[in-house]
Amino acid sequence: MEIYVKLILFFNVSDMDFLNETLLKNIKNSISEIVPKKKIGVAFSGGVDSTLVSKICSDMGFDVVLLTIGFPESHDILFSKEVNEFLKYSHHILEIDSKTFPTITSNIRNVINTDNLSLNENCIAFHYVSKLAKSLNLDTVITGNGIDELFCGYNAYREAFSGGEIRINEVMELKLDNELKMMKAVNVVASEFNVKILQPLLSAQFI
């Protein structure tokens, strides 16, 4: 939060308006460049990242289908329903079967061959997102991945703040590299269902 406060104090209102307009324009340009179809799924938790991407895609004329996965009564399922009461988009939910979950996770670990906890968790989640997309005849799914990496959404950025711009950029490059590697693994998992996972906020143009 400290870095955001300093940025807000540094810029005046007109500067912030310009930054907001430029950011929105760049997000739209990235979506237009990498998203080939008008009907798309959006991996949707109801959080800021997925809600932002969903709203922008809808405003751009895409036929948005929200895709939510989780265990029954999980936070993501409950919260996504609440948020979509305002968005009112097509919304589909896949509840994870706890009986088959261990087998699925074991299979995915064998495919991606890593002990990295975050990478495993995301690949497992996108296995189910891709399965849901496939059942709806969707082959393109958009995610909001990249917001935390690019806009200092991790505690590591607060810890790096005292090191100045150079240290913050070092942390950002590391976070982005990890995220890009993770999304490559995610697409390997999603390919089982012939689904492509796209990240407009991690495109080379946007970064």
Role assignments for model-derived ranges:
Residues 1-14:
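N-terminal segments that mediate ammonia production and transfer
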Residues 15-207:
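ATP-dependent adenylate-handling active sites, centered on carboxylate activation for C-N bond formation
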